[in-house]
Structure formats: C-alpha cells, structure tokens
Design a protein with these regions (language model features):
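Cysteine-nucleophile active-site neighborhood
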Residues: 104-173
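Short, glycine/acidic-enriched capping/hinge loops at junctions between secondary-structure elements
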Residues: 49-52, 78-81, 114-115
Length: 295
C-alpha cells in the first residue's frame, strides 16, 4: 500500500538498495484520507532510525502518511541541521492536522535521571498532548521508561550488566489485538542498561504487563484505559544493528559480551540469525489496524 514520505528522504534510497522499492509505494494524491503517523525521533543518528521504521511500516495494508517530529529545546549533534529543517517539524506544526498514531523512539540517555535530561520538560508536554489528541501511541525502549515514569511514577533501575540480545518473549495476553496471529513465543531485540519492574507496574490499576521474558523481564506494558503501549525493546531493529553496536563497543573496551541468541552458533564471525522480523512486522501491522479501527 502507498506511503506518503517527505520528498528526498534518505531512507528511500537506502531501502531501494535492500530491494524494498519505496518509490513504487509513494503517493501524493489519494481519494482516501491516509492514516497519519508521527514519529518523534530521539535517536542521535536520525536517518538510521527513520529507515528502520519506514522499512517496517512499508508493509502496511493501509495508506500511511509518515511525518517526523523534532524537539525545540534540543539540537541534534549527529544529524545535519539541513536534514532536520527539511524533514522534521515541531509539535505545533504537526498538530495542525489530525494525528492518528504516534511512535516515540528510544534515546541514549538512560544513565541520566529523567529530570536531568535537557529536553525533559518539552517531552512531558508532548506526552501530555499525545495522550489527549492521538488515538494510540507506542513508546519504545527509553521512551517506554520515560512514559511510565511521567504518567505513573514507575522508576527505572540500573542493571548489573547490559541487557543485550534477542530474547524469547511470551505474549501473556494473546487475546490482545496487538498479538493477533502471534505464536506462543516471539523474540525481541533488547539493548539497555536499565529496566522497569513488574512489581511496580502491578501497583498501578491502569497498567497491565502483556508480554514478558524470563531473561529480559517486562517487555510490553499497556494502559487499560488508553491505547498506549510501552515496549522495552526494539522490534524495529535492522538485522545488523546489534552487530554494529557490539563491534563499536568492542573497539572501546575488552569486557563486551556477545549479544545473546543473536549470532549463528553464538559466533560473531558467522553473522546474525534474524528471528524477530516476522513478529515485528505483525505487531506493527496489528497496531496500525487497531489505530484505524479504534477497537
């Protein structure tokens, strides 16, 4: 199904090299109103994250209008200002038209207390606005922790070592529309140094843990009263993301552990074995269908 993307977005050419011909999906005019999705991209390397999400959203059976949001209170250090000016808009600009769904990405700030993040106040304002004006929001990784803390005072805790790998995860509520078509076990990429804990979530009546891993802990939390989901991992990750991260860290220190359940035979030289892609696509497609249907 066609997508609407900003003209000239680098992700279009990147995905073409992966034999995903986004150009064939692009459209400017259509009789139907597209489902408008806004991605608040908090990651430092914007183009990589843009590509990850467009790759997975390109499987949508519905017409999507993809937009990217930027913060006013924080300037990206790793993405050119020209890119931000051309492809990103503020909340004030984007909120002039109806937004159906919103995705808030992770951010490399989990070692900092929430209140000390330089854009925390603006982020809180965006969270509050989304809750009142967007049909459904997905909070990813650090954003999931930030959303749970902002709305429900759920703390984050440092882990003794990095949670790093592709972890078997159980859908505890298979009847949830988000899990339609899921197997009894799916795998979720994790890359984090902190966690939220079930015992804190269980103290909040409005929250429910709907997916969990024996090894990596709480995986997906939902709001019972709103269409908000807090996902602690990165189902959107490309096949080589953890490999890139592993080799980057290996160049900095010697005590880096190999990501679990990721490489063939646990051998980095043999490359990653992709085990999460189909369920990742299914989860995002279920979310899009639910956003539109408003069940």
């Amino acid at each position: 199904m066609p997508l609407r993307l900003p003209d000239g977005l680098p992700a279009i050419d990147i995905l073409k090299r992966e034999n995903i011909n986004i150009e064939d999906m692009l459209t400017k005019e259509d009789d139907k109103r597209p489902l408008r999705i806004v991605i608040l991209n908090l990651m430092p390397f914007k183009a990589t994250t843009e590509t990850d999400f467009i790759r997975i959203l390109s499987n949508s059976p519905l017409l999507l209008d993809i937009n990217f949001m930027k913060l006013k209170s924080h300037a990206s250090k790793h993405t050119p200002a020209e890119h931000m000016d051309r492809f990103y808009h503020t909340l004030e600009e984007l909120s002039k038209e109806k937004i159906d769904g919103m995705i808030v990405t992770g951010a490399p700030v989990e070692g900092i207390p929430f209140e000390e993040v330089d854009y925390w106040t603006e982020l809180q304002e965006i969270f509050n606005w989304a809750r009142e004006n967007v049909r459904s929001t997905l909070y990813i990784c650090w954003a999931a922790q930030a959303g749970l803390y902002h709305f429900y005072d759920i703390p984050k805790y440092p882990l003794p070592k990095k949670m790093f790998g592709i972890f078997p995860t159980i859908p505890l509520k298979p009847e949830q529309p988000l899990f339609r078509g899921f197997d009894d076990v799916f795998r979720m990429p994790q890359s984090r140094h902190t966690e939220v804990r079930r015992e804190d979530i269980e103290q909040v009546d409005d929250l429910e843990v709907i997916a969990e891993s024996e090894e990596s802990g709480v995986s997906i939390v939902r709001s019972r009263s709103r269409r908000e989901f807090f996902i602690t991992g990165h189902l959107e990750y490309a096949p080589d993301t953890l490999d890139t991260e592993y080799r980057r860290d290996l160049g900095k220190r010697d005590d880096v552990e190999v990501p679990k359940y990721y490489y063939r035979e646990d051998n980095p030289d043999k490359g990653p074995l992709v085990t999460w892609r189909s369920h990742a696509n299914l989860l995002f497609m279920n979310w899009i269908s639910w956003v539109l249907g408003g069940e």
